[in-house]
Amino acid sequence: MKQLTVLFIMINFFLSAQEKESDEIAAAASNATNPLAFVTKLQLQPNHTWKDNDASQINITTRIVQPTGTLGLPFIKSKDPSKVYTIYRLEVPVISQTFPNATQFDATGISDIVLLDVVAFKQKWGLVGIGTGLIMPTASPKILGTGKWSSGVSGVVLNTKIKGLQYGVLFQQYWSFAGDADRQDKNFMLIQPILNKVIAKGVVLAFSPIMNFDWENDDFYIPISLGITKVFAKNLSMSLTPEYVVSGPTEGDFTVRFQINAMFPPSKN
């Protein structure tokens, strides 16, 4: 009888541990693909784009995502950080491009740094975020950037009510306001539809192409993409996403995106 009791306790402990691990993996999968998750993220994202005329571009972006219990600015505290908080996102891209059969210049160096500041509001069905963005002309050599200071607005709507499914949209609109007078002014919008579906334990299928509408030149860039994210632990995920431009001046460009995403509990501030 004692042996059966011990066996029962061991089985129950094992099942509880398995259930806890499964819940942690599910939570990590949700956090990895949710742009408004209250989780600190350190991401490394190498992208390789193949263009016409044997041209190519490698873009390695380092991204830091830091949530805080504030309202837009670090010194304005949220009354209820569990429902209203701020996400700061800093992107630092390093680009290497080659154009062997074109008039554009080969170059390698840092591109423009991007900073987003989004206030997130939790809803019964998901999340809403609204904020600002700043593009800094940090490119060196200058050919790798816009040469302009640009700022604008950003917003996110994300439905997370259904377990294992996220859908919504993220947009950013920028206007240039200063910078190199010899460079063209900037007025463009980025729209990113978001559709993430858990298809297996720790595996997420993601549709999230970034469309670019260049109002200044009356152009647009429409890609299609389908990526897969694998969560290896409660604090680590990797994703692979092929992307193809189906319409616009860069039609036919093919990009492979790879991302390593490390997640940490946010600082308590």
Language-model region placement:
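Bacterial Sec-dependent N-terminal signal peptides
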Residues: 1-19
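Transmembrane beta-barrel domains of Gram-negative outer membranes and organellar outer membranes
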Residues: 19-269
